[in-house]
Swiss-Prot record:
Similarity comment: family membership: Belongs to the YiaX1 family.
Organism: Salmonella typhimurium (strain LT2 / SGSC1412 / ATCC 700720)
Protein name: Uncharacterized protein STM3670
One Pfam family, short name: DUF4862
Superkingdom classification of source: Bacteria
InterPro entries named in the record: DUF4862, Xyl_isomerase-like_sf
């Protein structure tokens, strides 16, 4: 039986392994998360594997009916820290091709997992990362179109969802990826939808009303596929307009993301049409205990439930 109720949880930034802690702590973290209600599955990054201890470790330590949304963001950013040309929307042709090869790795990984467990991976979140330092949106759009022409033709066993990150045209870009209007134009003829992440849209305009606008734009284009909720802050441990997945307010007192924001996006989106909704939250304190890490996520789930009560 597949589990189609509940939320997709980006739990990895709360996991002890995110702070290079022991396997014993990691095991206990996933045990407690597995006992948490209202979870449909995980948003999980894939570097070489889906977990620092390997794919099988993750699958062994999480419920069999949990589904997985794979995200390319962590490896994309790791590679960009070494070479700012790495990305699907990069006008550096060599690095664009290197990024396409990384997506080939994801394709093979996902098909292998789904071959052993039908429907386990339900979606891949891809990203339109341009050549860092090149402000030319037309060149980035053209590069992204070339990448999609190749990637979208592979025989995927999951949905493809473009996660919008703050745009290269914003006032102070954190990721600086392709603007939403160019993304929507490029994916128009593909079976690819868009995921709006609350913080990543708010950061783009330094404006908490922008996530709703982006949600409406994607929906109007017939491309809204998912909503993910991460927070951002103006000050405190999570910084100023940083892409650090702050928890909800009031759990995180400085957070700009509230239950009201979830409610307005969900209402605008028509949740029954979405492939998934969920949260991705970070434990900022490397020395935090397991309980605090889990409580961040449980608070997030409770906020989602409160916001979506009809």
């Amino acid at each position: 039986m597949k589990n189609n109720t509940g939320y997709i949880i980006g739990a990895y930034p709360c996991a002890p392994s995110f702070h290079q802690k022991s396997e014993e702590e990691e095991t206990e973290f996933w045990r407690q998360l597995s006992d948490t209600p209202d979870i449909r599955g995980l948003e999980q990054p894939c570097l070489e594997h889906l977990h620092p201890l390997g794919d099988e470790w993750l699958l062994r330590h999480t419920p069999g009916n949990w589904q997985i949304v794979v995200t390319a963001i962590m490896e994309t950013m790791r590679r960009r820290s070494e070479n700012g040309g790495f990305g699907l929307a990069s006008s550096d042709e060599e690095q664009r091709k290197a990024c396409v090869e990384y997506y080939r790795h994801l394709y093979q990984k996902i098909n292998k997992i789904n071959g052993n467990n039908t429907g386990k991976v339900i979606a891949l979140e891809l990203h339109a990362a341009p050549l860092a330092g090149n402000p030319n949106v037309a060149q980035a759009t053209d590069a992204f179109a070339r990448s999609l022409k190749e990637i979208a033709n592979w025989d995927w066993s999951c949905d493809l969802v473009l996660e919008h990150c703050d745009a290269m045209t914003g006032p102070a870009p954190r990721k600086g990826f392709l603007p939403l209007v160019n993304v929507l134009e490029t994916i128009a003829d593909y079976d690819i939808s868009v995921c709006i992440n609350w913080a990543r849209s708010a950061i783009e305009g330094r404006d908490t009303s922008l996530p709703l606008i982006h949600t409406q734009q994607a929906k109007q284009a017939g491309k809204l596929g998912a909503l993910m909720f991460s927070g951002t802050t103006l000050d405190g441990e999570y910084g100023e307009w940083q892409d650090l997945h702050a928890p909800f307010a009031p759990f995180c007192p400085q957070s700009l993301m509230t239950e009201k924001h979830v409610k307005e996006l969900i209402t605008a989106a028509a949740p029954e049409l979405l492939q998934f909704t969920g949260i991705k939250l970070l434990e900022i304190n490397a020395s935090a205990d397991i309980n605090h890490r889990i409580n961040i996520l449980r608070d997030g789930i409770n906020m989602m439930k409160k916001a979506t009560r009809r």
